[in-house]
């Protein structure tokens, strides 16, 4: 590689600066003599050699990441990934690269969810804000401010008219999502970080889970706490309600998942097989029943397991799928190299997508119990994922402070 005269002079000055600032006086003197440099050190060369050196390493890392992405994209082309036209929507899965990478949050993203009706999505963050985006154009719409600490979870009611959020500031807030986008109620009652919230399908109650080891039910109309469910021995990480509304599930640092009857305070079943904190859960849609039954094994008579079925992701790096009616783990999915932080079923029921601290999103073929696609999604831990029920989109959030929109095809 040939340097121009000017580049050579600048390099010599930078070397001289490096030798001088690091105390190599004899070498500096000899170098100055041989390179014919003046003794006047110019300020602009201060620390230049180190800067160039570190930027080369940074660029090298970036090049390697881009090469990995390129290889992935080429593989897609070579394998002749069927186009949208050749596949049914039930077979569309998220594919790289992302359609949009949305920035604006000033801290880790804790949750991403789609609006049930409009072309909107919502992200919650440790920066204490909730942001609303148009996922079809990638445009930022607005921020909801009111929490004073990390927003841990957000959820819509079935019509998408109300949004509920919970925070490490111990509060739960209800927001009008039709016109004013104002906070219409704030509910207090938990003694520690509120980690998760969910509406019951009818929309008249909200459930919340907390680090205080309890789950509470709140009446939307009044904001009063009407029930407290106890049983978990440690931090309750997530609460998710079954679509029919009669059951809800929670998972905890105590390594268990509990399924509760909504209208009583009774725990229907406790699921224990994970070897570490259970971070996330997701109810399987009815469409997933046949794939899960097939995966459950040869001894399983066709349609033997009636469900409902629940998926769970843990810090033990595994994903498990359970038949809640009998309290049985039907299958275990292995592949992530770190904590599993988010789960979402494909609305068609054939696939499950997961987000992990290994920075990837994985697409699991349920019927064959295998990972069929890995997306190197973020620069840091992936914390949350959602699959749109009607449009071919997946969204993910990360500790890298970005929200990404992935198109399925």
From Swiss-Prot:
Localization of this protein: Cytoplasm, Cytoskeleton; Cytoplasm, Cytoskeleton, Microtubule organizing center, Centrosome
Matches recorded under Pfam families: LisH_PAC1 (PF24951), WD40 (PF00400)
Gene Ontology molecular function: any one: dynein complex binding
Coiled-coil intervals, chain numbering: 54-81
Domain LisH: 7-39
Keywords annotated in UniProt: Cell cycle, Cell division, Coiled coil, Cytoplasm, Cytoskeleton, Microtubule, Mitosis, Repeat, Transport, WD repeat
Positions annotated as WD repeat: 104-145, 146-185, 189-228, 231-270, 273-332, 335-374, 377-409
GO process terms (BP): cell division; establishment of mitotic spindle orientation; microtubule sliding
One GO CC annotation: cytoplasm
Role noted for this protein: Positively regulates the activity of the minus-end directed microtubule motor protein dynein. May enhance dynein-mediated microtubule sliding by targeting dynein to the microtubule plus end. Required for several dynein- and microtubule-dependent processes.
Domain notes: Dimerization mediated by the LisH domain may be required to activate dynein.
Record family assignment: Belongs to the WD repeat LIS1/nudF family.
Full protein name: Lissencephaly-1 homolog
């Amino acid at each position: 590689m040939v340097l121009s005269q000017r580049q050579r002079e600048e390099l010599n000055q930078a070397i001289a600066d490096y030798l001088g600032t690091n105390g190599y006086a004899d070498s500096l003197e000899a170098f100055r003599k041989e390179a014919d440099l003046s003794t006047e050190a110019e300020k602009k060369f201060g620390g230049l050699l180190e800067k160039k050196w570190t930027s080369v390493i940074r660029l090298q890392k970036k090049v390697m990441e881009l090469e990995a992405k390129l290889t992935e994209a080429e593989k897609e082309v070579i394998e002749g990934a069927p186009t949208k036209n050749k596949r049914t929507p039930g077979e569309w899965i998220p594919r790289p690269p992302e359609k949009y990478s949305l920035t604006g949050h000033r801290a880790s993203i804790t949750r991403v969810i789609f609006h049930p009706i409009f072309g909107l999505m919502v992200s919650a963050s440790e920066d204490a804000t909730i942001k609303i985006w148009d996922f079809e154009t990638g445009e930022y719409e607005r921020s909801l401010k009111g929490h004073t600490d990390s927003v841990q979870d957000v959820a819509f009611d079935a019509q998408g008219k109300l949004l509920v959020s919970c925070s490490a500031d111990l509060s739960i807030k209800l927001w009008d999502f039709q016109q004013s986008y104002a906070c219409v109620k704030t509910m207090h009652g938990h003694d520690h970080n509120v980690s998760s919230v969910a509406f019951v399908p009818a929309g008249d109650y909200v459930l919340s889970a907390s680090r205080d080891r309890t789950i509470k039910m709140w009446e939307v109309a009044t904001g009063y706490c009407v029930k407290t469910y106890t049983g978990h021995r440690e931090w309750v990480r997530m609460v998710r309600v079954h679509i029919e509304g009669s059951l809800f599930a929670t998972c905890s640092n105590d390594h268990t998942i509990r399924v509760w009857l909504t209208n009583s305070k009774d725990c229907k079943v406790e699921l224990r097989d994970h070897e570490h904190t259970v971070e996330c859960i997701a109810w399987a849609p009815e469409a997933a029943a046949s794939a899960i039954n097939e995966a459950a094994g040869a001894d399983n008579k066709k349609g033997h397991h009636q469900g409902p079925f629940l998926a769970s992701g843990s810090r033990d790096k595994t994903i498990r799928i359970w038949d809640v009616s009998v309290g049985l783990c039907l299958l275990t999915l292995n592949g992530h190299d770190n904590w599993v932080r988010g789960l979402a079923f494909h609305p068609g029921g054939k696939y499950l997508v997961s987000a992990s601290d290994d920075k990837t999103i994985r697409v699991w073929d349920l019927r064959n119990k295998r990972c069929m696609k890995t997306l190197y999604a973020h620069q840091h831990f992936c914390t949350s994922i959602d699959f749109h029920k009607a449009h071919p989109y997946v969204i993910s959030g990360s500790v890298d402070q970005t929200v990404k929109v992935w198109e399925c095809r």
